[in-house]
Amino acid sequence: MRKPLLLLLLVSVVLPGLAQNGKKVYADFHGVRYTRQHDGKLGRWEMYANTEKSITGRKSLCYNADLIDSEGRHEIAAVAYPQVGMQSNLDPDYIEYQILSAKVAKIDGFFIEWGFKPHENDILLREMQKVAAKYNFEIGVNWCDGWLYYDWITKIYPQINTREAKTGYMAKCYQYLVDSVFTGPTAPIVKGMPVFYHFGPGAKVDEYRKVLSEVKLPQGMKQPVALRRWADWGKLENDKYVPVTRSDEMDAWKQVGEIPTAWLPARVRTRDQEHAEWDNYATQDDIIEFMKPFRDSIWHSNNPAYTIKSGFAMP
């Protein structure tokens, strides 16, 4: 089946009874995918994108999941077709199937790609929590707060139309996460601390500092740990990938308690004959070089501010 597990966050932890390598494993969950039968719509199963700037020669991408071929397969936006067919992410039976499949794979929880309440991904989050509670499975967030700083929230609440107003609403969203996600039986907890992935690119550091100042933690809760996406691109020199080893922006995020964490490796090489269908790509050596700054400055660091260290794996 087409796995919704697009990335794995391997979180260092010293508690017994977890993964055999002593780490907790969280999988990023991208949604929401619907079906006509269950939801009356298709969601991320369909896709259209203008790709006129691509040097591959392909001018557009178009997947219409309402179209069905002679073998009964829908034209879905997916690299591989699901073994169980096209399903709705909100179907409790399918949620149960995915959670149990994840547990078999020694995955401890899902981080839902989430931007704000009441975005559709918040519905997915809450539906996941209902089923996860039955199976000792954790549901957290990959907080894409850029969604909040686009005009998406303004389309729902017209009065939230300035950065100041969006920052104020972000504080309410953080409080919601504290009250509804970082507590309870499905809370993602590592070493006694709630944890989430902070994708960005929404709030600036000063705005985020204001958000933190307005959030009230319940008695006994430790400050949630934010694993901050560090995805500086790097460059090619003499056909060798050279990663970014530090950045002023990431240093600023560390000042508000965020811990630098890897994301998708940089793809700095441009299309060639062997990679004709890609505008950019990376070699295996590039990927290793991309990860070295995280190894050297985070994993091997004795900095006590790095209370939780997270690695990254992508199938």
Question: Predicted segment positions?
Answer:
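Sec/Tat signal peptide C-region and signal peptidase I cleavage site
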Residues: 15-19
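Single-residue recognition of alpha-helix boundary sites
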Residues: 13-14, 203
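Glycan-processing catalytic domains of CAZymes
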Residues: 20-315
